[in-house]
């Protein structure tokens, strides 16, 4: 309400000031107004009465306002002037800074223009250098000595090195297996001894058979003569059967009976001896067959090993040719590495070649010798009886046998050791060994290969107390060293 009153007072002061001016010319104002003058005077008087108190107050407020304005106007002007001065100073400072910046920019532009001019001159040079470097890179990548060919050569080298390593490993394995070739001389010596013993036994057996055949033929002749004599004697006795027999005839009959019994015993002994000789011949034939089979197996193994060594040498020569062709394509950088690797590989291959060539020569010579000996053995075994030389001592013994037919034990003594050995060389039996596989297992149990030899004690410890006597095995020991090989045990077992 107070504010409203103050506003009304201010409005009233303004109205009074406006109304006082027309009082100087009331006539004119009245002409303009439509209201009567009486009403105006009344209204003015009323307004003066109403706003008398308010006018006094407004006058007091107006004085205060004027005082404030006298103080504020200079302050505001000073503040505005100071602001203008500060703004001018700032503008001047900014202008100076801008000028410095413009000078610096101008210098930079000048340097840039100079650099640009020089760069325009250097750009073609740089382009030429870039083109030359690009050409060099292309040459390095796809030139004669480029990275592509180097990579291809490196891959070929890796392949050839892998082939060489595989070939070297194969040769190492062959060298390890060549230990059998080293042991060939001993095996060949054993075969020579066994072949010699077989030849001796065959000769003795053939001689004994010839002597037996001659004695049997002569014994048949004597038997026929005796039978004819007996028939004649019986024919002579039949017509004089009714007569009284004197005492000398009785004694002759007794002599004939004893003679016939002796002849029967001699015939039985001859049959037994012939059976023993036949069994001995069968045993010798088995031994010869087994030993010939062993010889054939060893010869075939030797030929296979020689062929393998030859194929390895051929493969190594091919690999060396390929390696030489590929190594010639490499550059100077890889030349040193190649030379070192080739030197190592060639040294190894040369040593292996020399060893293989020596072993081949020795094996070929040994194989040729073995083949010659096998041919001789086959010629001896297949020789007919008609080409064999006669023996005078056998004829003398046959004559003594015909003169004394009851002396057959002397003939057995004449046959001597070959017949006894033939009787003793019958196959024996070992407990748990009935085939070649069982025999191989026996060698494996004792910790030896098939090429090794076993003693009687080793066989006894592996098989037990059911072993036969050592004398029965000694007959099959062709070397006489007290050790039994795989072939000797096969012959002894008859498998």
UniProtKB/Swiss-Prot annotation:
* SUPFAM superfamilies given in the database record: EF-hand (SSF47473)
- Where Phosphoserine occurs, the residues are 17
- For bias kind Acidic residues, which ranges apply? 37-50
- EF-hand domain ranges (all copies): 434-463, 464-495
Q: One MF term from GO for this chain?
A: calcium ion binding
Regions of biased composition (Basic residues) lie at 18-31
Q: List the residue ranges of the region (Disordered).
A: 1-50, 381-404
Give binding positions for Ca(2+).
477, 479, 481, 483, 488
Instruction: State whether keyword Lyase applies.
Output: no
Q: Does the keyword Calcium apply?
A: yes
Q: Which UniProt keywords are listed?
A: Calcium, Metal-binding, Phosphoprotein, Repeat
Q: Which InterPro entries match?
A: EF-hand-dom_pair, EF_hand_dom, EFCAB14
**PROSITE patterns the record matches:** EF_HAND_2 (PS50222)
Q: Per its record, how is this protein called by name?
A: EF-hand calcium-binding domain-containing protein 14
The record lists the organism as Homo sapiens (Human)
Which lineage do the record's taxonomy fields give for this organism? Answer: Eukaryota, Metazoa, Chordata, Craniata, Vertebrata
């Amino acid at each position: 309400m107070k504010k409203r009153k103050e506003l009304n007072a201010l409005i009233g002061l303004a109205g009074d000031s406006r109304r006082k001016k027309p009082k100087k010319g009331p006539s004119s104002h009245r002409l303009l107004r439509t209201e009567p003058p009486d009403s105006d005077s009344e209204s003015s008087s009323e307004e003066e009465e109403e706003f008398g108190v308010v006018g006094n107050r407004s006058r007091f407020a107006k004085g205060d306002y004027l005082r404030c304005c006298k103080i504020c106007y200079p302050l505001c002007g000073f503040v505005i002037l100071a602001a203008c001065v500060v703004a001018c100073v700032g503008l001047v400072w900014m202008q100076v800074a801008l000028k410095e910046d413009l000078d610096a920019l101008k210098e930079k532009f000048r340097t840039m223009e100079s650099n640009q001019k020089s760069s325009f001159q250097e750009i073609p040079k740089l382009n030429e250098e870039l083109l030359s470097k690009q050409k060099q890179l292309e040459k390095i990548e796809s030139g004669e000595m480029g990275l592509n060919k180097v990579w291809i050569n490196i891959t070929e080298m890796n392949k050839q090195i892998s082939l060489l390593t595989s070939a070297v490993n194969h040769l190492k394995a062959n060298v390890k297996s060549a230990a059998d070739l080293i042991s060939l001389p001993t095996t060949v010596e054993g075969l020579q001894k066994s072949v010699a013993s077989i030849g001796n036994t065959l000769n003795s057996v053939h001689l004994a058979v010839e002597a037996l055949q001659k004695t049997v033929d002569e014994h048949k002749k004597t038997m026929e003569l005796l039978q004819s004599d007996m028939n004649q004697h019986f024919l002579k006795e039949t017509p004089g059967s009714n007569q009284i027999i004197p005492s000398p005839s009785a004694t002759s009959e007794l002599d004939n009976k004893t003679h016939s019994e002796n002849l029967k015993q001699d015939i039985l002994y001859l049959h037994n001896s012939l059976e023993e000789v036949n069994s001995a011949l069968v045993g010798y034939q088995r031994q010869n067959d087994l030993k010939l089979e062993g010889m054939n197996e060893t010869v075939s193994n030797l030929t296979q090993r020689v062929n393998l060594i030859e194929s390895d040498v051929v493969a190594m020569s091919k690999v060396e040719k390929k390696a030489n062709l590929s190594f010639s394509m490499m550059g100077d950088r890889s030349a040193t590495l190649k030379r070192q690797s080739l030197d190592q590989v060639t040294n190894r291959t040369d040593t292996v070649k020399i060893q293989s060539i020596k072993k081949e020569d020795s094996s070929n010579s040994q194989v040729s010798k073995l083949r010659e000996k096998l041919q001789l053995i086959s010629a001896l075994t297949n020789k007919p009886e008609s080409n064999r030389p006669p023996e005078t001592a056998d004829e003398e013994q046959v004559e003594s046998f015909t003169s004394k037919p009851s002396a057959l034990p002397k003939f057995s003594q004449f046959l001597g050791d070959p017949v006894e050995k033939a009787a003793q060389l019958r196959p024996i039996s070992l407990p748990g060994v009935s085939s070649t596989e069982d025999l191989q297992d026996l060698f494996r149990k004792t910790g030896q290969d098939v090429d090794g030899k076993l003693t009687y004690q080793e066989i006894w410890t592996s098989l037990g107390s059911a072993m036969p006597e050592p004398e029965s095995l000694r007959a099959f020991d062709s070397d006489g060293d007290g050790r039994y090989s795989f072939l000797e045990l096969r012959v002894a077992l008859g498998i």
